[in-house]
Amino acid sequence: MGIQKPAWLDALYAEKFFVGCPYHETAKKNERNVCCLDCCTSLCPHCVPSHRFHRLLQVRRYVYHDVVRLEDLQKLIDCSNVQAYTINSAKVVFIKKRPQNRQFKGAGNYCTSCDRSLQEPYIHCSLGCKVDFVMKRYRDITPFLKPCHTLTLGPDYIIPQDLLTDDEVAAYETPRSTVVDGDESMSWSSASSDNNNAGAAAAYAATTTHVVRKKRTGFCLCAKSANSYKEVSEDPDDISACINRRKGVPQRSPLC
């Protein structure tokens, strides 16, 4: 009999995200958008400080569906052959299957679980579809799991500062790894040394310009219009006139 799925995987699939936190109903920004893999529950930003030593996975929203960053998810489970999408230069993967209103058969690959049209060489449209495929075919998800003892939130995640101490604020402000764009070859990792698990993994493998914006001021425009820095007037009255210079009164076009 195959080993059951890990508890955090079931929680990631079953928990409801982007709903109000019942423990912080009156607080602002209380949407649950983090999954604690150790407690197997969803968290809001106000809950995060009490779980700061646990493995935390941020859940994002894309076209009204829950997604997770591919860089974070592949630390937990093999995500090869799962189609990823790009949001703000970060690759994300859908957590659950997405319903389709109509079936469209054309050229290309199709999802192994829901028949959704995919780009080559992908054969799964979501994490849930791959897990279902593996469980039905191999009865064991263990060969696809990866050992992950620490998982922190990204630097773009905002935690209410009034809930943190000075030491915690400094800890959360330390640099973390950034998103690496691009697909990398996935290595098989197994939590068990059983030969059957290695065989299942092998069988599956065979199947399948930084821009800086500056505020424009009247003085800068005046200096820029001069041919050289020597031509810029040093008279305070001229400088004041340049800074306070405004367009004339707008003229309305005559009515025909």
From Swiss-Prot:
Alphabetized, the UniProt keywords read: Metal-binding, Nucleus, Zinc, Zinc-finger
Query: Protein name, please?
Result: Protein RGF1 INDUCIBLE TRANSCRIPTION FACTOR 1
What induces the gene encoding this protein? Induced by RGF1 peptides.
- Localisation: Nucleus
Q: Name one GO cellular component term.
A: nucleus
Q: In which tissues is it expressed?
A: Expressed predominantly in root meristematic zones.
Which GO molecular-function terms appear in the entry?
A: zinc ion binding
Which InterPro entries has this protein been placed in? Answer: PLATZ
